[in-house]
Structures are given as C-alpha cells and as structure tokens.
Amino acid sequence: MKINDLTPETENQYFCCLEEWSEDMKDAGNGKQKWYEYMKDKGLRVKFAIDDNNAIGGMIQYVPAEHSMIEGKNLYVVLCIWVHGHKQGRGDFRKKGMGKALLKAAEEDSRNLGASGLVTWGLIIPVFMKASWFRRQGYKVVDRDGIMRLMWKPFNDAATAPKFIRPRRLPAKGKDKVDVTIFKNGWCPNFNIAYERTIRAAEEFPGKINLNEYDTKSRGVVEDWGITDSIFIDGKKINIGPAPTYEKIRKKIAKKVKKLS
C-alpha cells in the first residue's frame, strides 16, 4: 500500500468520494468541484490510499481550522476519512489498514506544515467516522455536540484546544410562505445531495416557498450564524446525514405548505 496526493488525473474520483457507481451521487451536482476550486489554494490537503494492485481504496481530506466547522488556531482539521466499503464499484477496502495509514500521513503532513495539532470529529454511534476508532489512534475528546465528538492530537505544548462552532441564531418560521433555508459549504457530496434535492423540491411549490441559500465557504456567514452545513424548513432543522430522499424532503415541505391554506 502507498499514500499519494491528489493529482489532476484523480480529481474526478475525489469529487464523488470514490463512488462513481452511485446513482445518488448524480444528485450532488458540482458542489464538491466548486468547493475544491475555491479551497485548493487555501490549504486544502487530499491524500489517497492505494493498494498493491494500484487501486484507490480510501481518501482523507483536511483543511486549516479557519476553513472548517471548528474554532481553532494553527490547527488542521480532518473533514473526513473515507475507506470505500461498498460491494459496488471498486469494492470493499476496509480492514486493510488504509484508515490508519491515511491518518498517519495527515499527521506527518500537518506537522511539516507547522500546525500545532490535528483535529477531527467522530460519532459515538457505530457508523462512519467512529469516535472510538480515533480514540484508539491517540485522539482525545475536547468538545461535544449531540452524538458528535470533537477530538484532537496536539503536536506541541503551544497548541490550544479547539471547539465546535455553535449556532448564534437560527432561521425563523415563514409567515406568508414556507421558509426553506440552506447553509451549504460544498465539501461533502452527501450534504450536496441533500441540498440539491431540497432546492428541486422547493421549486415544486411556486409562490409558496421563501428559499434562502447561504454559502458557508464565506467565514463571515459562519461567524454571523454559527452554522456550516444545515437545512431548515420553517425553522426546523432536518437530518441530512445520510441525505434524505427527494420524496422525503418534498413531503416535509408539502406538509408545511398545506398549513398555509
């Protein structure tokens, strides 16, 4: 196995998170590519794990803290580590040490870039990005938000612990129309799928929807709202991990529209 950096030849695999086979991925639009074009000169780092057959099986992406969902100084933040585990497409690459190798490479790279530590998030439920896995790699919890844990590995005594950015205000319920508010960053295709489906669903109700879209690549938007990736329908946050189906989103909006009359 080897760890390679992103190249122009592997960009398309990166944009779809190694899931070229996925029908759902078609709903993601070009949000990830736009985010990449914006971030590629702002400290974004991407690495791939490649097996002995020269097949890409996993990836890691990490950014400076000031371009992430956390508050921190002189830190890099892992947005995600993803080792392809589906039978479809390229197949299952789990349990081969790719995740550990990717994380180690990111730590070494972050040190060389002068960062004081590497930060990540983890979930306390047994799914993607498990907090328990990061704990075994030497990461410690420094903040909590629901089922999410903010974890880090400081590299020196000068490192200051990070914390989650928390909402400073929330979208309000609509008055004469249903309010649909989207906070979109673009780094995650799963979130982008949810955003694109929500926009399509909102368009099904002309004259009934007040659609607001905020680009959270802008740090000013993040500092104003304290929100990075979310969808609100009439002031209520909906779950977008994993991305809900178009039908489910449309049903939520239709229910609110019905109450207008």
Each model region followed by its residue ranges:
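Conserved GNAT acetyl-CoA-binding A-motif
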Residues: 108-124
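Conserved acetyl-CoA binding element of GNAT-fold acetyltransferases
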Residues: 71-93
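Conserved acetyl-CoA-binding loop-helix of GNAT-fold acetyltransferases
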Residues: 90-108
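Conserved catalytic-core motifs of GNAT/GCN5-like acyltransferases
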Residues: 121-122, 138-152
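Conserved beta-strand in the GNAT
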Residues: 48, 55-66, 77, 82
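Local sequence-structure signature of Cys/Sec-based thiol-disulfide redox active-site neighborhoods
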Residues: 167-204
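Short amphipathic alpha-helix that is part of the acyltransferase structural core
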Residues: 1-51, 55, 188-190, 197-200
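Non-catalytic, surface beta->alpha helical segment in thiol-disulfide oxidoreductase systems
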Residues: 235-261
